[in-house]
Design a protein with these regions (language model features):
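A short, hydrophobic C-terminal helix/tail in secreted or cell-surface proteins
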Residues: 260-264
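Noncatalytic scaffold domains of N-terminal-nucleophile
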Residues: 1-32, 36, 44-225, 230-232, ...
Length: 264
């Protein structure tokens, strides 16, 4: 048995019990944001939406308003389960011929699919699909929530203003993607420090934070302008311009995305 300390650490999570409600996410502060919504009288969907927006600030390597997802909602009085599908979609102009297989094994991604030339399907502007997250949250709130859109974004805005804590896990995830992040000025500026992953201090002390001024500004605008601005308004124009400048094919027509109505 290898007793090397660096290879034998055990990470544990304490069990939590509640008679009223529990919020679970990949970041404690995001879960706290959702729990606070419940404590203030919001329902489970209100808490889920607030948590989702907040975790997009605190866990950007797995969550974000540029992504998508699915939601299941159980209505206890009726016993019905409702589903909302707001997954990403391929851009209208996408041509599979632009993504030839390289024959070099599997991708350098979480998913072991066949590798594409230059990793075009997982890195850079050519990997960006039509995002459904923002509209999915709109559909959830309008059909099952009790809070306003603006209220629901406040925890995420507060988290963005405070900045993301750079702990060992954040350093690990950013470091693992540093080569790709260095390729583009915007991601290099956002996540790296002088081209290197940010890191917490070796000794005890205040944990450094990474601030995302552009994301903070975007969330504030989204809270005021409403969710459809992301697909039809100023944010949509900025999104398309930036992606086009980097070689992507996302268009304004692609962004005319409307999440389907909830289904049982």
């Amino acid at each position: 048995m290898d007793h090397n300390f660096s290879e034998s650490l055990i990470t544990r999570k304490e069990a939590v019990v509640s008679s009223k409600g529990i919020v679970a996410s990949q970041h404690k502060l995001a879960s706290r944001a959702g729990a606070k919504v419940l404590a203030e009288g919001g329902n489970a969907v209100d808490a889920a939406v607030a948590t989702a927006f907040t975790v997009s600030v605190l866990e950007p390597w797995m969550s974000g308003i540029g992504g998508g997802g699915h939601m299941l909602i159980h209505d206890a009085p009726s016993g019905k389960v409702h589903a909302i599908d707001f997954g990403m979609r391929s851009p209208i102009g996408l041509d599979p011929e632009d993504y030839p297989l390289s024959g070099e094994g599997v991708a350098s991604d979480l998913f072991p699919w066949p590798r594409v030339v230059e990793d075009r399907n997982i890195v850079g502007a050519t990997s960006i699909a039509v995002p459904g997250q923002v509209d999915g949250m709109r559909v959830a709130l309008e059909n099952f929530g009790s809070r306003s859109w603006k209220e629901s974004l406040q925890p995420a805005i507060q988290a963005a203003e405070a900045g993301m804590q750079i702990d060992w896990y954040a350093t690990l995830l950013i470091g693992s993607a540093a080569a790709e992040l260095n390729h583009y000025p915007c991601t290099r500026e956002t996540y790296l420090v002088d081209g290197h992953p940010p890191a917490p201090p070796w000794t005890a002390g205040a944990v450094p934070r990474k601030h995302f001024p552009y994301l903070t500004k975007t969330l504030k605008h989204l809270a005021e302008a409403g969710p459809r601005d992301f697909y039809e308004g100023r944010l949509a124009s900025t999104l398309v311009e930036d992606i086009s400048r980097c070689g992507g094919i996302l268009s304004r027509d692609c962004l005319l995305y409307t999440s389907p109505s909830p289904r049982d």
